[in-house]
Amino acid sequence: MIERYSRPEMSAIWTDENRFQAWLEVEILACEAWAELGVIPKEDVKVMRENASFDINRILEIEKDTRHDVVAFTRAVSESLGEERKWVHYGLTSTDVVDTALSYLLKQANDILLKDLERFVDIIKEKAKEHKYTVMMGRTHGVHAEPTTFGLKLALWHEEMKRNLERFKQAKAGIEVGKISGAVGTYANIDPFVEQYVCEKLGLKAAPISTQTLQRDRHADYMATLALIATSIEKFAVEIRGLQKSETREVEEFFAKGQKGSSAMPHKRNPIGSENMTGMARVIRGYMMTAYENVPLWHERDISHSSAERIILPDATIALNYMLNRFSNIVKNLTVFPENMKRNMDRTLGLIYSQRVLLALIDTGLTREEAYDTVQPKAMEAWEKQVPFRELVEAEEKITSRLSPEKIADCFDYNYHLKNVDLIFERLGLA
């Protein structure tokens, strides 16, 4: 991932240095397991633990000849050792090291993402409680529907992110799995104890069965979860973008002193952070499709997945780490304009209360069709003539003969629509 969208802690996980260090840890742990079984002398393993090292430039130099990165790595490590070098990679195949180390790196990345998600959920929760009763227009198909609150909108986001948090925990468990089962998964040249030992030391589970590789449905599921989280963030960001339009201006991203919105137009205050979220989500969703393409490998393995995963797994975790942190700050510092929300509610001249009038007429004994046919012409007239809907209702004898002035006034009270806000918040555990 390019530096612009990278945060140091996450990026550090995916450096060549950290990747090779993970490979080395798998190699040494495997030797420790062999020592427990009495195959490798414990003194040799002690020396390996103390002295085994690598030089990245040397690995790359060797790889020019071997055209195999793991062989280059093991040779470079062997050069740092004495007689005990013969135990490097003992009984292992390349993917025993690579796949197990990859899962270990993903575990490191997951620990960061989990904290990011939990922080984001908490930020949305506090913002929802702050705006629990901030009344605003609910829109369906982009058209004014009925009143809601900004707090309810945020509470919806909070509940969605709680689901994403649970999905992530499940995907985390599914991907934090290692395998050291040999060339085709039969443990022909490796004792299953070695796999169990290494995985336990790394905080991974051992795959119940594998071929030369871990099966890539795990990685596809993991990437799908990252993509869904990114898409939820995009969904929220698109909402902010819509509400920040000049003709709406119900919310606005924080605009810092000295910030510029346009090179040409000094007045511009654009929702660039939210727009950025949309672009980043597109990238992660694209990576998800690549992960799905990686599932059908040939027989017990091929390496068609390898080149893709070197890109998509680091990039996706780095990108989501960036998204979660940037959008958390956008929500936390979001400027909300309650007066604009109320002003926008009035722009449709009371049409948002049409259902209340409809139901009130039904309560007097009209059929639904009769009530609808009575109210709709008045609503259409309000649209077309830009006349307050309430005035037309109060002038319509078919309505006033059934509804008292007090009842009509009651139909146009937005507080009616907020009567269950407390109940919804309690149901969500946000009270």
From Swiss-Prot:
| A biological-process GO annotation | 'de novo' IMP biosynthetic process
Which EC class is this protein assigned?
lyase
What domain of life does the native source organism fall in?
A: Bacteria
Q: What is its EC number?
A: 4.3.2.2
What changing R301 to K/Q does, per the record, is:
Abolishes enzyme activity
- Identify the PROSITE patterns for this entry: FUMARATE_LYASES
SUPFAM superfamilies the UniProt entry points to: L-aspartase-like
GO cellular component assignments = cytosol
Q: What is the effect of changing H89Q?
A: Abolishes enzyme activity
Query: What GO MF terms are annotated?
Result: (S)-2-(5-amino-1-(5-phospho-D-ribosyl)imidazole-4-carboxamido) succinate lyase (fumarate-forming) activity; N6-(1,2-dicarboxyethyl)AMP AMP-lyase (fumarate-forming) activity
**Catalytic activity line of the entry:** N(6)-(1,2-dicarboxyethyl)-AMP = fumarate + AMP; (2S)-2-[5-amino-1-(5-phospho-beta-D-ribosyl)imidazole-4-carboxamido]succinate = 5-amino-1-(5-phospho-beta-D-ribosyl)imidazole-4-carboxamide + fumarate
What are the entry keywords? Lyase, Purine biosynthesis
Q: In which pathway does it act?
A: Purine metabolism; AMP biosynthesis via de novo pathway; AMP from IMP: step 2/2; Purine metabolism; IMP biosynthesis via de novo pathway; 5-amino-1-(5-phospho-D-ribosyl)imidazole-4-carboxamide from 5-amino-1-(5-phospho-D-ribosyl)imidazole-4-carboxylate: step 2/2
The record places the active site at: H141 (proton donor/acceptor), S262 (proton donor/acceptor)
Quote the annotated effect of Q212M. Abolishes enzyme activity
Q: Which Pfam families match?
A: ADSL_C, Lyase_1
Binding residue positions for N(6)-(1,2-dicarboxyethyl)-AMP = 4-5, 67-69, 93-94, 212, 263, 268-270, 276, 307-311
- PANTHER family recorded for this chain? ADENYLOSUCCINATE LYASE
> Could you describe the subunit structure of this protein?
Homotetramer. Residues from neighboring subunits contribute catalytic and substrate-binding residues to each active site.
What's this chain's function? Answer: Catalyzes two reactions in de novo purine nucleotide biosynthesis. Catalyzes the breakdown of 5-aminoimidazole- (N-succinylocarboxamide) ribotide (SAICAR or 2-[5-amino-1-(5-phospho-beta-D-ribosyl)imidazole-4-carboxamido]succinate) to 5-aminoimidazole-4-carboxamide ribotide (AICAR or 5-amino-1-(5-phospho-beta-D-ribosyl)imidazole-4-carboxamide) and fumarate, and of adenylosuccinate (ADS or N(6)-(1,2-dicarboxyethyl)-AMP) to adenosine monophosphate (AMP) and fumarate. Influences the affinity of glutamyl--tRNA ligase for its substrates and increases its thermostability.
NCBIfam families noted in UniProt: purB
What the record says about family reads:
Belongs to the lyase 1 family. Adenylosuccinate lyase subfamily.
What is the protein's given name? Adenylosuccinate lyase
Name the source organism.
Bacillus subtilis (strain 168)
Report which gene this protein is encoded by: purB
